[in-house]
């Protein structure tokens, strides 16, 4: 998989992709992450990527020309499954979407900034608009990092223990069951006896019951689908 991220602040996320699971995925050749500075696609001496909006609205708007140049340059080199724009008013990102996008070959993620992008880009070049939550961030860079992490980590081979990834919260619209490690007792706080029993079937049953209970209590909306 290849993910191309277009941003006005590459330094904001470069470090994120050089550690932990994201670095491991790239080292294994299972994912490529390329970060593109939008200012490299400007043609004026000030390298401007924003301008005042028509209509006298507040804020600044990302200019159409550098975005179009960058996207078209990338698309001339290879085909892309999706051209994604990070925006608070997009479709809500969730595990189901991450699973689907992980099957893609190539993705472009355009990070929103300022008041937004010239809407013509959204009309003519963007294929999917995604939000990671009902709140506003300084820019779409953090959203792009969140999405890339959720997508890449479930590519087969990225995580050595694939069963661990499959049992994470939200994979079955359920929250994960509680987990424990040694010592079995600490200051009177005990690990549930069932987990020490070695009885695999009963442990699986306990895990499902705990997942259901936690989901009903903390995220009942997940059980409504």
UniProtKB/Swiss-Prot annotation:
Residues bound to S-adenosyl-L-methionine: 112, 132-137
Enzyme class of the recorded protein, top EC level: transferase
Annotated catalysed reactions: guanosine(37) in tRNA + S-adenosyl-L-methionine = N(1)-methylguanosine(37) in tRNA + S-adenosyl-L-homocysteine + H(+)
Keyword Disulfide bond assigned: no
GO BP annotations listed: tRNA N1-guanine methylation
SUPFAM superfamilies named among the record's database cross-references: alpha/beta knot
InterPro entries membership: Alpha/beta_knot_MTases (IPR029028), tRNA_m1G_MeTrfase_C_sf (IPR023148), tRNA_m1G_MeTrfase_TrmD (IPR002649), tRNA_m1G_MTases_N (IPR029026), tRNA_MeTrfase_TRMD/TRM10 (IPR016009)
Keyword annotations from UniProtKB, A to Z: Cytoplasm, Methyltransferase, S-adenosyl-L-methionine, Transferase, tRNA processing
Enzyme Commission number(s) from the entry: 2.1.1.228
Source organism, top-level taxon: Bacteria
CC terms in the record's Gene Ontology section: cytosol
Single GO MF annotation: tRNA (guanine(37)-N1)-methyltransferase activity
Statement: the UniProt record of this protein carries the keyword S-adenosyl-L-methionine: yes
Oligomer status and interactors: Homodimer.
PANTHER family on file: TRNA (GUANINE-N(1)-)-METHYLTRANSFERASE
UniProt family annotation: Belongs to the RNA methyltransferase TrmD family.
Known role: Specifically methylates guanosine-37 in various tRNAs.
Protein name in UniProt: tRNA (guanine-N(1)-)-methyltransferase
Organism: Bacteroides fragilis (strain ATCC 25285 / DSM 2151 / CCUG 4856 / JCM 11019 / LMG 10263 / NCTC 9343 / Onslow / VPI 2553 / EN-2)
């Amino acid at each position: 998989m290849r993910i191309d991220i277009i941003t006005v602040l590459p330094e904001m996320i470069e470090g994120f992709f050089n550690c932990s699971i994201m670095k491991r995925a790239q080292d294994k050749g299972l994912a490529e992450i390329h970060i593109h500075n939008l200012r490299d696609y400007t043609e004026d001496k000030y390298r401007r990527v924003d301008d005042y909006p028509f209509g006298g609205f507040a804020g600044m708007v990302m200019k159409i020309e550098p975005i179009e140049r960058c996207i078209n340059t990338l698309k001339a080199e290879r085909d892309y499954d999706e051209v994604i724009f990070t925006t608070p008013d997009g479709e809500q990102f969730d595990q189901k979407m991450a699973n689907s996008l992980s099957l893609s070959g190539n993705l472009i993620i355009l990070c929103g900034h300022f008041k937004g992008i010239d809407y013509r880009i959204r009309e003519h070049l963007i294929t999917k608009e995604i939000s990671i939550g009902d709140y506003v961030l300084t820019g779409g860079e953090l959203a792009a990092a969140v999405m890339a992490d959720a997508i890449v980590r479930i590519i087969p081979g990225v995580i050595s223990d694939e069963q661990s990834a499959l049992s994470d919260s939200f994979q079955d619209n359920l929250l994960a069951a509680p987990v424990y490690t040694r010592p079995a007792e600490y200051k009177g706080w005990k690990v549930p006896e069932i987990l020490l029993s070695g009885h695999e079937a009963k442990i699986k049953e306990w895990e499902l019951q705990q997942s259901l209970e936690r989901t009903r209590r903390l995220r009942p909306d997940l059980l409504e689908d």
